[in-house]
Amino acid sequence: MAERKYFGTDGVRGKVGTFPITPDFALKLGWAAGKVLASQGSRQVLIGKDTRISGYMLESALEAGLAAAGLSAAFIGPMPTPAVAYLTRTFRAEAGIVISASHNPYYDNGIKFFSAQGTKLPDEIEEAIEAMLEQPIDCVESAELGRASRIKDAAGRYIEFCKGTFPTELSLSGYKIVVDCANGATYHIAPNVMRELGAEVIEIGTSPNGMNINEKCGATDIKALKAKVLETKADVGLAYDGDGDRIMMVDHLGNVVDGDQILFIIAREDLRAGKLKGGVVGTLMSNMSLEISLKTLGIPFIRANVGDRYVLEKMVENDWKLGGENSGHIIIADKNTTGDGIIASLAVLTAMAQHKLSLNELASAVKLFPQVLINVRFSGGTNPLESDAVKAVAAEVEKRLAGKGRILLRKSGTEPLIRVMVECSDAELARKSAEEIVEAVKAN
């Protein structure tokens, strides 16, 4: 694979106004993508975005570039990332573009592409776009220019798709649900999905102004959701991130239910229904309790590198249909092609309604092991993890934790940091073990 100059693991991302998140680069990127896609017979691309104020600027620039290459753009407005993947497929568009920086602050933004199948673009297409970016823009003849249009019922189409994953014989009638949309792309989708399925919905984080996305709300900051659930005596709270591909939940007692617990609830329900295909993919950060709980049910479990992209790769490699991260990216491959917060939350609500159990009762099957995370800064070019002394201490700790805990030591890819993670059923043992490793790292 050729080295990438522009595309990272999740498209192009950065601070607005700083290369590459500038209007001139977005126009050039639209043109380059348009040229590559047009050479394969493409004619229409869908463009969706989250609620950042910079989305207007970037979608206009992308559309201009696409038009110059002869491709038409269909705008679908603020829309969750998984909705863009779904609509790209159902509209038979040749590609989809998402303008979002997910859980980042409003002053960041990003651009990523979906294939016609609603999946990540093949590596060879991304590489061809990178190569085209090095060429000067040349505009097609006037008669061949692309056009711009708007799909006005995109939100309604996705709402119906989400509702279609909830069993028709069940209802959310009688449930009081607090929905926190992070002032992001799900603000006009998630509350309507829950309401139309019968729930009483209390909304927070549904008043985007272009600059308040992910600000003290949503899946990455759920204090407001916990408070609202307790204040209103709600049955459950749902928190999505800015682009709607993550979900975190809160039970009626105010306890957070994270991605690991959500993954277990869905896996167990699929197993009961005879719908679980293969096993479950987690990540290096997935709690050991998830692994133990799944294996108790006879469900295979493997770990991928951190990042939903790597989870999906392992799922495809093993032909498994369920995977996710403790951060709330949950991929249910027989329902959508990417992480989908609304679909995942509906899968948990299905289990609640089906068995008439609270979220607290469902999640209690996975008692998460305490996790201790410590970042250790080091100087110099030598990686402390390669030291024999550190390796010896790590091996001793692993031996001590055998069967009841684990360690994960990683060197940061962007800073001179060693990330030390220890988890164990015994919180005090986890803390002492982490401190022991940290001291060894500092000494080297």
From Swiss-Prot:
The organism sits in which domain of life? Bacteria
- Could you give a single Gene Ontology term from the biological process aspect? peptidoglycan biosynthetic process
Question: How is the protein modified post-translationally, according to the record?
Answer: Activated by phosphorylation.
Any one GO CC term of this protein is: cytosol
Cofactor binding: number and manner:
Binds 1 Mg(2+) ion per subunit.
- Select a single GO molecular function from the record's annotations and give it: phosphomannomutase activity
Q: What residues bind Mg(2+), as annotated? A: 102, 241, 243, 245
EC number per UniProt: 5.4.2.10
The modified positions for Phosphoserine read 102
Q: Which reaction does it catalyse?
A: alpha-D-glucosamine 1-phosphate = D-glucosamine 6-phosphate
Family indicated by similarity: Belongs to the phosphohexose mutase family.
Q: Kindly provide the name given to this protein in its UniProt entry.
A: Phosphoglucosamine mutase
What is the native source organism of this protein?
Mannheimia succiniciproducens (strain KCTC 0769BP / MBEL55E)
Q: What gene is this protein a product of? A: glmM
